Structures are given as C-alpha cells and as structure tokens.
Curated annotation (Swiss-Prot):
Usually encoded in the trnK tRNA gene intron. Probably assists in splicing its own and other chloroplast group II introns. It is found in: Plastid, Chloroplast. Belongs to the intron maturase 2 family. MatK subfamily. It comes from Batis maritima. This is Maturase K. Keywords: Chloroplast, mRNA processing, Plastid, RNA-binding, tRNA processing. HAMAP family: MatK. GO terms for biological process: mRNA processing; RNA splicing; tRNA processing. GO terms for cellular component: chloroplast. One of its GO terms (molecular function) is RNA binding. InterPro entries: Domain_X, Maturase_MatK, Maturase_MatK_N. It holds the Pfam family Intron_maturas2. Its main location: plastid. The gene is matK.
C-alpha cells in the first residue's frame, strides 16, 4: 500500500474521489486486493490481472449509464434494455469492486491521520471472537437485565447516502453512487441470481457506515444523559432526545423522587455488537432497560426512518432467560450458599447468592445445520454424506475431522460440553457410513475389517493437545469436557456446511 500512497493523497479541502474512477492503478489495486497477504510486488505482476478491470471499460460503463433515459428503469422496459440484460455481471462486478476501494479512501486517510504521533497498540488477541466471552464472564455477574437488539436494515437508500455525505464531499461521486444503488435495487430481483458472485465488500462497507452512524448517536445520547444527570442543580426529565432540565422542579421532586436521579445514569451499562446483533446490559431493574428499549425504537423511527418491529428488541433477565449471542446460549446461574457464623454464644445463618456466568451449546440449531448439510436427519440420527463418496478415503476422513475440530474448538468455552459427545457421535457415524457406502459395504463389516481405532486417532486430537497443557491428575478426556477454555485465535465462526 505504501507504493500507492502518493496516488491516494487527496486534497484536504475538496476530497475529490470522482477522478479516481479513471485511474488505471485503482483497478489493479481493486482486483488484486486479496493479494495483500502475499508479497506486495505481486501487485505489479500481470499473472492475476484481468483485462476487464480497466479504466477504459469503466468509462464506457459510466457513459452508458448516464445515457439512459430514465433514472429508475421501470419493470416494463427491463427486458428491452440490452445494456443491463447482457452486461449485468460485468456492470455490477466492476462498479461494486471499484466503489469498495474508492469510498474507503477518505476513511483510511482520516484513520491514518488520527494515528500520527500516536503509538498504535497491536493486540491480535482482541480480534478473536472468544475475547468477548471473558469480558462477559467478568461483567455479567454484576448485571441483571439485557436488551437483545437485532439491528434493522435501512429501508431507503437515501439514508445510506446521507450517512456517506458526512465523509465524502465530492458531489460527482455521490451522484454516481446514488445512481448505482438505485439501479441495483431495481434490477437485483430480476437479474441477480441467488448465488451471486458479486463482491460483498462494497455492501458490507455501506452497512458498517450505517451501523457506525447509529452507534455514534447512541453513544452520544448515553454520554449526554450521564452529563446532564451529573448536574446537581437540575434533574433530567425522561424524553426521547434526553433533554429538558427544569430547575424549578428541583425543590418539589428532590425529596420524594430521589430514585429519578439515577434512571438515566447507569455506570454499569455495557454494549457489545457482533454482525447484525447487539446487546445492552444493565445492572438496574426492568424500568431502566424498558426506557432504553423505548429510546432504541424512537431512534430508528425518527432519525433513520425505520419502522422497528417489537420482535427486534427483547428484554431478557439473565437469571431466568438464555441470551442467544455469538452461537452460545448465555445466562447467569444463581448458586445459593448457607454460611453459619458464630459470635460468642450466638450463631447466625447467612444466605449468600453467588452469580456464575453459564454458557450452553445450542444443540437444536447445530443439529438443524448438520441436517441441512446432510450429515444427519432432523432428529439427529447420522446418515451418509453421499456427495463425498467420489473423494478418497483420506479426504473424506479429513473433512469430517476438520468439521469436528472446528466445532470443538469454538464451543470449548461451554460450561457443560457433554453435548460435544453427541456432535462427535453424529460426525463419526456419518463418516463411517459414508466410507462404507463408498466401498459398498455395511457399517459393521467395514469396522470389522479396518477397526474403529483409526477414527480415535483423528477425532481425539483436541484432547491430545490439551494433555500437554494440563497435568494428568484426571484423564485428558474428562478434563477436556470439564474445563472451560476460551481461545484467542478465532476470527470468524467456521461454516462447516461448505467443507
């Protein structure tokens, strides 16, 4: 990227992006973006460069786009438009890939400029998905209620454009972006197949920009509520926009309504987001969390013009309900302990309640995914994987082992990992049935001929790794299924369906 830094320098007063659409090096950078993990010199090689990623072709595309008679093409003339019907793949792929690179430039420059003169702390462990769970394990024991939020998608494209308008000041780029989004939204139902090969980076960038704007407003309201509440000369009246200090009401309500003072100020509130879901946890009772639910709904409806459904926001009590987040079912378990305390001749019984963070494997969803991938039926009974019978024995076994390791690796933080026995059983029997089907034999005859030890050598490798980490006081298998372990090298949830 350092080689292109000179070309990517923008004028600070204008931030013009439109001329970059006609620079050839942008297309080389866009097409070879995935090679950033390889040698940087490969960007200048022609081995992986496609001629269709060219500024000349994009010039023709943009010219033909603007030559269309209608800004939004109706359904009547869709079939008559030869440009969109014959060149739809080329149109969407090239424009989306190039837009993804160009619109990120202002954000990258702002990020780099903000880090000038500052030492950037690099911690790869914080990038792991499992790094969230130790935080929840430490914090959730002090919390009571959680607001489980499913972030809604914007219903109008102008909302996305207004979000980008804060960062991109180039009117020509915004106009081209608006034109492309409107054309895509009107044509995708007719021409874009379900299994499209479009570059999702651009649409992911739009969604992240929208979520960033939403979270910025949310955090601003949170800070404003705390700041206004900290003033001793007034009280905060609960309203949508968190404003309305009335000094004259202080003398009337200060004695009778002391509890109002902390309704909007909660130092124990925590916010976590992953993909399209977020959680807002609080230490206080249901009244405060209900108010935050009301604020969420009004924020979406008033600012983003999104009609929020009630099923998108759920209030859960951690001691009673399970929280479905990041593939785990999390909750707080209440352990009641009775302690006898004796002072001189008097003895007392003290009841103590200890909250413990509990994580559970969602077996119903895992079995549903395994059934969808044809490893078992809907009841969890293993079946053969018929589509893999053309592969070699070692390749079939390696696929099943890799699926089990991914699941065991991710769900190693569960409080009770007995359900992993069931997952292992499904995959092992499915593997044996697949191999037996390939060799046109029965399961019993196949196991009798080869023996069952060849499966144990692969599927128990996770336990063999743990044997080097812990002492052999107990058996490794028992320790593996009793100890909760959070790994800090998991950057995404593995999709075992495609393995």
């Amino acid at each position: 990227m350092e080689e292109f830094q000179v070309y990517l320098e923008l004028h600070k007063a204008h931030n013009f992006l439109y001329p970059l659409f006609f620079q050839e090096y942008i297309y080389a950078l866009a097409h070879n973006h995935r090679l950033n993990r390889l040698n940087r010199s490969s960007l200048f090689q022609n081995g992986d460069y496609d001629n269709k990623f060219s500024s000349l072709i994009v010039k023709r595309l943009i010219f033909r786009m603007y030559q269309q008679n209608n800004f939004i093409i109706s359904t009547k003339n869709l079939n008559q438009n030869t440009f969109f019907s014959h060149n739809k793949n080329l149109y969407y792929q090239i424009i989306s890939v190039v837009l993804a690179v160009i619109v990120e430039i202002p954000f990258s420059i702002r990020f780099i400029s903000s880090l000038e003169g500052k030492e950037l702390v690099k911690s790869h462990n914080l990038q792991s998905i499992h790094s969230i769970f130790p935080f929840l394990e430490d914090k959730f024991s002090h919390l009571n209620y959680v607001l489980n939020v499913l972030i809604p998608h914007p219903i109008h494209l102008e909302i996305l454009l207004q979000t980008l308008r804060y960062w991109i000041k180039d009117a020509s780029s915004l106009h081209l972006l608006r034109f492309y989004l409107y054309e895509y939204s009107n044509l995708k139902n007719f021409f874009i197949p379900k299994k499209s090969t479009l570059n999702p980076r651009f649409f992911l960038f739009l969604y992240n920009s929208y979520v960033y704007q939403y979270e910025s407003i949310l955090f601003f309201l949170r800070k404003q509520s705390s700041h206004l509440q900290s003033n001793s000369f007034g009280i905060l009246i609960e309203r949508i926009y968190f404003y309305g200090k009335i000094e004259s009401l202080l003398k009337v309500f200060i004695k009778k309504f002391q509890d109002i003072l902390w309704l909007s100020k909660d130092p124990f509130m925590h916010y976590v987001r992953y993909r399209g879901k977020s959680i807002l946890a609080s230490k206080h009772g249901p009244l405060l969390i209900s108010k935050w639910k009301y604020y969420f709904v009004n924020l979406w409806q008033c600012h983003f013009y999104v009609w929020s459904q009630s099923k998108r926001v759920h209030i859960k009590q951690l001691s009673k309900d399970y929280l479905n987040f990041l593939g785990y079912l999390s909750s707080l378990r209440l352990n009641f302990l009775v302690v006898r305390s004796q002072m001189l001749e008097n003895s007392y019984l003290i009841d103590n309640v200890i909250k413990k963070f509990h994580t559970k494997i969602p077996m119903s969803s895992i079995i549903a995914s395994l059934a969808k991938a044809r490893f078992c039926n809907v009841l969890g009974h293993p079946i053969s994987k018929s589509t893999w019978t053309d592969s070699s024995d070692s390749e079939i076994l390696d696929r099943f082992v890799r699926i089990y390791r991914n699941l065991a690796h991710y769900y190693s933080g569960s409080s009770k990992k007995k359900n992993l026995y069931r997952i292992k059983y499904i995959l092992r029997v499915s593997c044996v049935k697949t191999l037996a089907r390939k060799h046109k034999s029965t399961v019993r005859a196949f196991l009798k001929r080869l023996g069952s030890d060849f499966l144990e050598e692969f599927l128990l490798e996770e336990e063999q790794v743990l044997s080097l980490m812990f002492s052999r006081v107990f058996s490794v298998s028992q320790r593996f299924y009793r100890v909760r372990i959070w790994y800090l090298d998991i950057f995404y949830i593995n999709d075992f369906v495609n393995h």
